[in-house]
């Protein structure tokens, strides 16, 4: 298996074979994200991808049960190529149960509902959509490249195709001020409308080399404190009414790991936040937070 540059995956894909289909992110304009800044986006040649599958078959002995398609936006590939990759994977790994990928909202919207359903039928079982926020104001500010309406359409299109929809939201993305509350309430509203199966809340980290980091250094962006980040998380939980949704905030960026099913576990998780805010439960120290 061959890889170009640093490889990222969701925490839940730690057991997966990571197959790099694209290099970098086709959007790569988000002001907060430093993951792919060192990569010029391109799609790997199909010949190399299929060779990697055969190499992985030999390495794993055909016994792999999960595969994750890297980098940030494999769904942008041509439909026929994606189907070929999926078919080769399920042929190479007879025990394969699911193939997953990140799904950029703009790239997702280039696929019709029928095309996404076809990908699901060929074994694309899960998509991770970086929603980050439901606020148009914040989406524009961080150069996400889509409107809230387009983000909602991308998520609904994936879910309605039968693909298991996992979304990521970013606590603290709006910084301090009036936009903070709008960010959280609009995000909760989008979750209620999008109806994902899983929501992963991550906490903003200012990454050197990103425009948001530069804005912070120049005094144009004021980040929230750890306590304010937890207050945002609590507000989010209190305003998600659709269920059942599996909710986690166990990513290394978070100050307090949480896990539960909404809305059944809302009270338990908000109580855990209150305990941390009162100083009764320790929060993850800054030096232990990571991407």
Predicted segments, located by residue:
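Auxiliary Fe-S-binding modules of radical SAM enzymes
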Residues: 1-13, 189-291
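Conserved strand-turn element in the central/C-terminal portion of the radical SAM core barrel
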Residues: 106, 134-138, 159-183, 202-208, ...
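Non-cysteine beta-strand/loop elements that form the S-adenosyl-L-methionine
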Residues: 22, 116-134, 163, 169, ...
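Conserved SAM/AdoMet-binding glycine-rich loop
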Residues: 57-160, 241-242
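Conserved, mostly hydrophobic/aromatic
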Residues: 25, 33, 49, 69, ...
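Hydrophobic faces of well-ordered beta-strands that scaffold small-molecule active sites
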Residues: 17-19, 65-67, 97-103, 127-129, ...
């Amino acid at each position: 298996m061959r890889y170009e540059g640093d490889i990222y995956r969701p925490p839940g894909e730690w057991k997966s074979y990571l197959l790099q289909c694209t290099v970098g992110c086709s959007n790569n304009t988000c002001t907060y994200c430093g993951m792919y800044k060192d990569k010029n986006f391109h799609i790997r040649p199909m010949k190399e991808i299929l060779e990697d599958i055969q190499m992985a078959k030999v390495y794993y002995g055909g016994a792999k049960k999960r595969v994750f398609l890297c980098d940030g936006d494999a769904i942008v590939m041509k439909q026929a190529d994606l189907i070929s990759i999926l078919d080769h994977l399920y042929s190479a790994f007879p025990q394969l149960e699911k193939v997953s990928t990140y799904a950029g909202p703009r790239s997702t919207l280039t696929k019709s509902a029928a095309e996404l359903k076809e990908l699901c039928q060929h074994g694309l079982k899960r998509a991770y959509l970086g929603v980050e926020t439901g606020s148009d104001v914040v989406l524009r500010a961080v150069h996400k490249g889509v409107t809230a309406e387009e983000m909602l359409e991308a998520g609904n299109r994936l879910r309605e195709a039968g693909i298991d929809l996992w979304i990521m939201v970013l606590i603290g993305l709006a910084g301090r001020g009036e936009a903070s509350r709008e960010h959280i309430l609009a995000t909760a509203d989008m979750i209620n409308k999008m109806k994902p199966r899983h929501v992963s809340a991550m906490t903003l980290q200012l990454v050197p080399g990103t425009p948001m980091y530069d804005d912070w250094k120049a005094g144009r962006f004021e980040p929230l404190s750890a306590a304010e980040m937890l207050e945002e998380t609590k507000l989010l939980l209190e305003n998600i009414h659709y269920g059942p949704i599996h909710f986690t905030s166990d990513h290394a960026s978070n100050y307090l790991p949480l896990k539960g099913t909404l809305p059944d576990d809302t009270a338990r998780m908000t109580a855990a936040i209150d305990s941390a805010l009162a100083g009764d439960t320790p929060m993850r120290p800054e030096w232990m937070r990571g991407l």
